[in-house]
Amino acid sequence: MRAEGTTAGSLADDADDPDADGADGAEPTPAMVDEPARSDGFVRGLSEAIGGPLGEHAVRPPRSEYGGSRFWTPVRVVMALALLTLSLHWVQKSPCRDGAWADLSQYKYFCYTDVLALYYAEHLNEGQVPYVDHAVEYPVLTGMLMGALGLPVHALNQRDPSLNPGRAFYNLNALVLGIFGVATAAMILALRRRRPWDAAMFALSPALFVSATVNWDLFAVGLTAFFMYAWARGRPALAGLFLGLATAAKFYPLLLVGALLALAIRTNRWRAMLYTIAAGTATWLAINLPVAARYTASWSEFFHLNRTRGIDWGTLWYIGEHLPLGGGRYGLYWFQRLNEDPEHGRLNSLYFGLFLIACAAILMLALRAPRRPRFAQLAFLVLAAFLVFGKVWSQQYVLWLLPLAVLARPRWGVFLAWQAAEVCYFVAFYGELMGASGHAVFPEWVFVFASILRLVTVCVLAGFVVSDILQPERDPVRQTYDDDPDGGAFEGAPDAGYLPLLRSWP
């Protein structure tokens, strides 16, 4: 993909070179490139098994004439790891790729994917066009992707009836989503040229391994990563374009505007953010208005479903509704009553109100912090709050948090604890699905406690991010960079003159 003469591949190549310009304009030297075995206590402890970190006076391999010190540079290693993880994910899903799901095999082998299930449920196998022929529960750009990949497969199947259309559709989607997954790793590398090993947290993520093609979320994750890169490089209009595209694919990228708003208030710098919002709005409208005008009922299905949807698996509200109380009793009465309203008005008001309170707290944190927080830190906190208090927390939503977690707090210890909790939830969720299908494999409390573990680890990770904001000298990114490599127009910006007045507000 080309953006103002720059390709995603060249971005990763830039990160390959330790002498490439840093985000703050300085030229990193090899000594300025972070080495986790030195800077991360968890990795340093693991490195003792192979002799410990590289010594201060160790001789590094000579640089080649092509700019890299050797072929397997950190960037190439990370990109290879991302490809490996996504390839292994494809293998892990292989028992389900033929679409012949019998005797709950899609749950027994942990290989269920909405991509294949919805190929038939949304009538893509019949050549129908999303929004035109029927309503789709996803935002417009995701529906367009479904149709753009489904129609060619249907046409091929018409010519060759021996083709398994479900398998072909899944494989094609896995390829496209894999490209966006690798592109996300490339964007993280481009944003962290002095910290290339941070991107390995994304590339090696167990959550990426188990969830990459459960749904089309990697499509929006990749577009969001492009948005963050364009913003960091001071291209607000291009950032707005990608923000509009990402929001047209999944609604969650819109939440990142809240982080930009908090930084704009703190610095009194508004122009770049307003350009981005304007470009994003124009892009979103250009994609949505034609569909909304001609196929209003189909277009509005996404909003109707989200408004009327009840308590979903694994959320805070599900935990309250099914909390084990002993004696075979489950659920707190007040939580159970929330799900009785067919329109779920009380539930919507409550979760949205709690989310707004959390956003207000994040804004106060951004204004009262001793140093301006980084964009990725605030973005992670806003999105984490949305998931913690939301009424839907699907297993693949972990992909939303992954890049932001890496950019917000690149420390392996807590990150791996969170990933372990996500894997526990993944396994428990498939057991829960089998139970819902009449083949119980464990008591309800097992899934409830897996849900609690996931929620708690996300909150703990958010707590560490808050701690880094309040004690910026502990922020690992600011130990490598002078300021915020993702900050864009806010990087190096002084606090607004009115900030002391805002801080004095109770």
What are these regions (language model features)?
Residues M273-F355:
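Membrane-lumen/periplasm interface segments of specific transmembrane helices
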Residues R2-S300, Y351-P506:
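Multi-pass membrane glycosyltransferase architecture that uses lipid-linked
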